[in-house]
A protein has these predicted regions:
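Conserved mixed alpha/beta core segments that line enzyme active sites in large multi-domain catalysts
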Residues: 1-212
Length: 212
C-alpha cells in the first residue's frame, strides 16, 4: 500500500493543487503533422488530478504538445469554451470529502496566485452580456492556461523533466504530477509517479479489401 500526501494548498476551506495531470515523454496525440512526438505532451487540469486521469462526460482536460505549448486543436473559436474544463475536483476540509465545484466559483476566490495564468475571460460571452445590458463583471472564464504556457518556464521545465526521465529509463515514460504557484508566479512541481509508457505497439499490417 502506497500512501502519499496530497499536493496542494488550502483555499477558503478547500484543498487542491493549481495544476495536476499526466505527462508522456512521447506524444501519442499527434493530430498535426508538424508535432514533434519526442517533445512529449501533457494532459492537465486545474485542481485535483482525478479529471486528468478519469474521463468525464462534457468536461475536457487541456492537451499540451510540448514542442509548441500554445498550439491548439483545429476547433472553432466559439467551441473553445465547450471543449475545456468546466468543473474542478477539490478536497473539502469542511465536509472531509472529495467534492466538485465550477471553475467560475473557484476562480472568483483568492487562489494565492495570478488567476490569469490559468483562465481568461470568455470574450464571446462578455460581448453578448454587454449587448443584453447584463453585469459584465460576471462573465465566465475559460480554462485555457494561455499565460501559463506562453509566459512562464513551466512547459520548458516539464519537457526537460520528461526528457531526463526517459533518458535514464532508456524508454518512454509516463508521469503524474502537480504544480503549485505563488503570487509572484514562481512555482513548485511535484513528481508523483513515473513508470514506463505502456502502448500496444503498431500491431500487424491489415490489408483493406477492395470494393467491387
Amino acid at each position: 500500500i502506497l500512501v502519499q500526501r496530497v499536493s496542494g494548498d488550502n483555499y477558503n476551506k478547500d484543498y487542491y493543487p493549481h495544476i495536476a495531470g499526466v505527462g508522456n515523454s512521447s506524444n501519442l496525440y499527434v493530430w498535426d503533422e508538424n508535432i514533434d512526438m519526442n517533445a512529449g505532451m501533457l494532459r492537465m487540469v486545474f485542481g485535483l488530478g482525478t479529471r486528468a486521469v478519469d474521463r468525464t462526460v462534457g468536461d475536457y482536460a487541456k492537451i499540451v504538445s510540448l514542442d509548441n505549448p500554445l498550439r491548439i486543436p483545429p476547433i472553432n473559436y466559439k467551441d473553445q469554451r465547450k471543449f475545456s474544463q468546466h468543473y474542478v475536483d477539490v478536497l473539502s476540509l469542511e465536509q472531509n470529502k472529495l467534492i466538485t465545484k465550477s471553475i467560475d466559483e473557484l476562480i472568483s476566490n483568492d487562489i494565492k496566485a495570478d488567476k490569469e495564468l490559468f483562465a481568461t475571460i470568455d470574450q464571446q460571452a462578455l460581448a453578448r452580456m454587454r449587448e443584453l445590458g447584463l453585469d459584465s463583471s460576471q462573465a465566465p472564464y475559460i480554462l485555457d492556461f494561455k499565460k501559463l504556457l506562453g509566459k512562464t518556464k513551466f512547459p520548458t521545465l516539464m519537457r526537460d523533466i520528461l526528457a531526463t526521465l526517459s533518458k535514464v529509463y532508456n524508454y518512454p515514460v509516463d508521469i503524474e504530477f502537480t504544480a503549485n504557484f505563488k503570487s509572484d508566479n514562481s512555482f513548485k512541481i511535484n513528481l508523483l509517479q513515473c513508470r514506463p509508457l505502456q502502448t500496444r505497439g503498431l500491431g500487424k499490417p491489415v490489408k483493406v479489401p477492395e470494393l467491387t
